[in-house]
Structure formats: C-alpha cells, structure tokens
C-alpha cells in the first residue's frame, strides 16, 4: 500500500521496538556500542557513524521526499556544506540563485574566494541567463523555490532538466515548503535538502539538516563523507525531529491558512508598498507554483512604505509576531532581511536580488488567525504615529 504524506509522518518508526514493545521509538543516547567479540562489530559501533534513533528519522524523511535514503546533519548549513564537499572540487562551478538564503550566499562566496570551487549567482527565472551559466558546464546547480525572502518561484522540472543536459547535478532546497507541499525529486532533482530546524521539526527547539538522494549509491557516499567530516545529527535532535515530524501535515495546513488570510489583510494596507506570496497572481512564478506545489505555503514578505523609523515603530507595535530569525515553527516570526537573514550579503548583492531596506519576512505560525491580524493592525497603527 502506498502511504500518504500524513500517514508516513505519523507512523514512521512506530511499533518497531522488539525488545520492550515501545509504541514510540526510544532515544538511543549512547555514543559507542560494544562488539559481540573480537572483530565482530554490531550494526552500530559509534554514534557519529550510525545511531538507531537517527536511522529512524532518516528513513522517515527519505520516504516523505520519495528518496532512496537520507543523511541527517547537525545543521541546515552542514547539509549544504556536505553536498558541496562531496560534489565540488577546485575549479568546479556551482550555479546558485542570485537571491538565495544569506547564509548559503556567505558560505559559497567565502569558499569560492578560498579557491574551493567557483560560484556564479544567477537569476534562475531568466532562462537566457540560466542557459548562459549552464553553458559553462557547472558541476552542481542549486535551486531554491520558493526563494528567500521574496518567494519567487522557478520551474524546478525545467531547471533540473537543463542541468541534466549540461551534465550537472541538481539539488533543491525545499526548506520553505517541506515535503508536505512540494517534492523536488519527483520533479527531476537529483538531491533535495532541508534545514530540519524549520517546518520539519516545527517547534524551534532543534537545529538540524538533511540531504535526501534519489540514487542509493549517492546516499552511501553522502553518509561516508558526513561521518568523515563530523556533521551527522545527534540522537536527541533526531528524537525531537521525529516527534515534530508527526504533526507536519496539520501544522502546514493551519499555518498556510493563516498566511492566506494575512495576505488578504495586507493587500488592504496603505503602508504596504509591495507584497510577496506565491498565491498572488502578480507574484513571480505564480502559475508555476500552482502547478508544481501542493499549496502556496506559509511564508510571505512585504515592503513597508517608509523609512527606518517607520520600520522601528511598526515592529515595536507587535506583540504576537516575534522578531527573530528562522522560520517554520508553530509560533509566528517576523524578520528584517537586510539586518538579519540576509545581512551576510553585500548591500549591492541585496539590491541586485531585490531585497529592500524595508523588507519584512513573516513565518506564519498556527495561532488564531484573527489574533495575528489584530496584532498586525497594532503594528500599522504604531507605524503611523509620529
């Protein structure tokens, strides 16, 4: 029987404990495991290489994304670093989105300057620019869709197809939607990665990442390197992640419903100069999103019509939206891209990506939607006070 996403998330690892019959899989905190005899190791010998709790959540994540296997890492950035470590060597070219996550941009730019590989940041919605970059025969193409923070959507199937024709490996960062709303491997990607810190865990109490591959041999290679460079996820984070994963589908449903209501509210506000969400017909890639996604998601961003003082007054008027980085938790968060999530980008790079100084990003939580809109109303009221 082919299981649906919600069933996979809830049932993964249940009733697997043959020793005690635990319904919920136990947490295995031991760092090392004894041998049964001389030169007779068990299935696990050291937790950096393999851990029973991590095994369970890796199987769950692989099944959710339709992959051959998964490698859990200790952060989302470790997942990105693992992919570039495995597939890029000096002289190889990485093609990445011009508006990618600020942490990814900083990592790629820094390692390229050290000669680890070359990187080219491209507007992947511009087919001519993308084809020009692919003509240089990159080894790896990274896709983010929807993009961070402007929620631009690109055609994953098309980009992965073009990458394959160019001989490149395609990897999609699916953090903003989760497998509940998008499955890049089914769209032609070779790899998919997540910051598990976000929607997959959903409670802002785990830092982890994952790489999921379509090919079993690639999974083996990724796992080998993850062990070697010491980026595998911990048992405790694996346990919390698996617990959070069980409510992924209902969390995404409520958060997305709240986001759509907030978008409708923000459309009526005079202080909102620009609004970004894939549900909007004018949003870049709206038609693509309707085709390749199972929902428009719970992330949105908007530009305030004003200066820094307007921004400060607006934020000071909020009480339910927490001013913090990250996203995907049950609580609603708001962040200022230029000084927070994308502070690692040079001002000219932010400008080229369309990230203004008054851009705010919202990660919609699962609070009551009417309360969230009332809180935004308080923010706009404060912003209008001189």
Predicted regions and their residues:
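Positively charged, small/polar-rich N-terminal and surface patches that mediate targeting and assembly
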Residues: 1-6, 12-14, 52, 274, ...
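N-terminal glycine-rich, Lys/His-bearing helix-loop that initiates the first secondary-structure elements
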Residues: 1-44, 385
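Glycine-rich, charged/polar anion/phosphate-binding loops
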Residues: 8-16, 194, 227, 259-262, ...
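Conserved PLP-enzyme active-site core in the AAT-like
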Residues: 11, 70-269, 276
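Conserved N-terminal alpha-helix of the aminotransferase class I/II PLP-enzyme fold
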Residues: 32-81, 103-110
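PLP-dependent enzyme catalytic core of the Aspartate aminotransferase-like
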Residues: 109-110, 118-120, 132, 136, ...
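A common structural junction motif
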Residues: 229-230, 318-328, 379-386
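Conserved C-terminal alpha-helix-loop-beta "cap" of PLP-dependent enzymes
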Residues: 274-360, 364
